[in-house]
Amino acid sequence: MKTLLLTLLVVTIVCLDLGYTLKCNKLVPLFYKTCPAGKNLCYKMFMVSNLTVPVKRGCIDVCPKNSALVKYVCCNTDRCN
């Protein structure tokens, strides 16, 4: 019985992510990275002159303010950027 409980515990630990980790797209959305602790937002950065093509994507802790030249879009779910 103890062996069964130990086996179930190990399987649970392996299958579950004990600390939620966010995954954000890199510049090319086919690739993503797992965000380090404390970086709980994904972001996309655009040049205001061309809002259709993002110039940077990744993980961030606080969404930056937009400026006259750069626009940021932030979100908090896996690969949302």
Swiss-Prot record:
Q: Which GO terms describe its molecular function?
A: toxin activity
- Gene Ontology CC terms: extracellular region; membrane; other organism cell membrane
Q: Which organism is it from?
A: Naja sputatrix (Malayan spitting cobra)
| Secretion signal, residue range per the UniProt entry | 1-21
Specify the protein name: Cytotoxin 5b
Record's superkingdom? Eukaryota
Keyword Transmembrane part of the UniProt annotation: no
Function, as annotated, reads:
Shows cytolytic activity on many different cells by forming pore in lipid membranes. In vivo, increases heart rate or kills the animal by cardiac arrest. In addition, it binds to heparin with high affinity, interacts with Kv channel-interacting protein 1 (KCNIP1) in a calcium-independent manner, and binds to integrin alpha-V/beta-3 (ITGAV/ITGB3) with moderate affinity.
